[in-house]
Amino acid sequence: MRLSIIEIINSMFSIRLFSPAKINLFLKVIGKRADGYHELSSLFQTISAGDILTFQRQTIDTLTCSDPYLPTDDSNLVLKAMRLFRSKTGLDLHLRIHLDKRLPSQAGLGGGSSNAATTLWACNQLAGEIVTTEELMQWGSEIGADIPFFFSKGTAHCTGRGECVNSLEPLAHCKIWIVKPPFGLSTPEVYKHLNFSQPNENNNDYASFKEKPYFNDLEASAFEIKPELKILKNTLLSSGFDTVLMSGSGSSFFCIGQGQIPASFKAFSAYFINRSSNRWYSTLPKLT
């Protein structure tokens, strides 16, 4: 099929991208740093659930969102990312952006960070790929610790605050279930409840992941804030899943295995995904 001149021109000025969620297959909190942040060691993995972002060049910046409760002002990471790209490159690039928000907020799935990374990628594409992926990764760390991860290929061991990214070979494709309770959790509040006086036997390197996979040091503090989360986890484990783990600072859990999700729970299925070099993420066909 041949494209018309108008279609070709329009494709140069607009782009539509998938913005994937992430889960933490393990998350170790090593300690609190002098700057007030926490030193982490975590295995990040992108999954096939996510948002959709549409970008179109225009003369002023605008952001709209399918979720009326999500702020679309300067506090939104999408606008922060666009303006960061403009300040770094000096380009007079303005965009009309629409966010089709499908991921729940305060779920530990990295939705906002993914949106920001996707925006940086889109800006670079619309500008003619004038900077490298490594530069985008470095810039992203200035506005969010989890943003650099999304410039890996989708599987990475992340350290520091999360911004130090060691890309890894893709893991085997795996079907999971994401279960999100009707409430979210504030990341700062979860970290505030960490108790370093209690000994923790979890290792903090990727090599030990095969020996003791799937742990999250933030679960205990999340359970202290919301005791019903522990009940939810135990219910999911008793339903037959091999693994049930909170992702990030919560409040969602990912489940692996052949269990059954209770009908009263809000849940959706997803799969591990990765991206190819010089391409952004896309969803995979459903696995059987």
Swiss-Prot record:
ATP binds at residues 104-114. The keyword Nucleotide-binding applies. GO terms for molecular function: 4-(cytidine 5'-diphospho)-2-C-methyl-D-erythritol kinase activity; ATP binding. Its EC number is 2.7.1.148. Pathway: Isoprenoid biosynthesis; isopentenyl diphosphate biosynthesis via DXP pathway; isopentenyl diphosphate from 1-deoxy-D-xylulose 5-phosphate: step 3/6. Keywords: ATP-binding, Isoprene biosynthesis, Kinase, Nucleotide-binding, Transferase. The active site is at 22, 146. It catalyses: 4-CDP-2-C-methyl-D-erythritol + ATP = 4-CDP-2-C-methyl-D-erythritol 2-phosphate + ADP + H(+). Gene3D superfamilies: 3.30.230.10, GHMP kinase, C-terminal domain. Belongs to the GHMP kinase family. IspE subfamily. This is 4-diphosphocytidyl-2-C-methyl-D-erythritol kinase. It comes from Protochlamydia amoebophila (strain UWE25). The lineage of its organism: Bacteria, Pseudomonadati, Chlamydiota, Chlamydiia, Parachlamydiales.
